[in-house]
Amino acid sequence: VVKLILSVILELVFTVGVWAQDGQGPQIPSVKIKNVGGTVINTADFGTTDKPVIISFWATWCKPCIQELQTYHALYPEWQEKYGVSLVAVSIDDARNASKVAPFIKSRTWTYEVLLDINQEFKRAMNVNNVPHTFVVQNGKVVFSHSAYSSGDEEELEELLKKLTGKK
């Protein structure tokens, strides 16, 4: 069992590294979902330029998700300035909990785009099995994928942003 888990982890690390180097990850799927303001967004429009887009799947009940997004919130202004990055948080809260999302993000003063994937169509299209799950998209391709969160993951993400944008 340990060997199997280790081999899966190594395969994921290798695959992510390859995506980041050659930009040939899978195409971001086209799913229409609403943002917290009610505007319909097509997910295929994310990351269509060389400016990276961070997409983070989360839920209001997920403590590691909130910890990750709070960390991103603190770093986001600097990352926008340095790397031209955009951040999109995709809530997978279902219809019963979706009404909690807007007040939740308002109380935390998150300034990035928040989408409501109430039917979890985008989640399924991106093969997200658990949250938090973070992707980076550039030129229409998924170039990074990471599941779970622990303190320090944002440093790995910033290193990737440096590589993708050629900035230090």
Give the label of every model feature segment.
Residues 32-53:
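A short beta-strand-turn-helix
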Residues 54-55, 87, 134:
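Hydrophobic beta-strand anchors of alpha/beta hydrolase catalytic cores
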Residues 67-107, 119-124:
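Structural microenvironment flanking redox-active thiols in thiol-disulfide oxidoreductases
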Residues 50-53, 58-61, 94, 130:
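Short pre-active-site segment immediately N-terminal to redox-active cysteine/selenocysteine motifs
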Residues 18-22:
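Boundary at the C-terminal end of the N-terminal hydrophobic targeting segment
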Residues 50, 103-110, 118-160:
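Thiol/disulfide oxidoreductase modules built on the thioredoxin-like
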Residues 3-17:
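Bacterial N-terminal signal peptides
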Residues 62-66:
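Short, thiol/selenol-centered motifs that function as redox-active sites or metal-ligating centers
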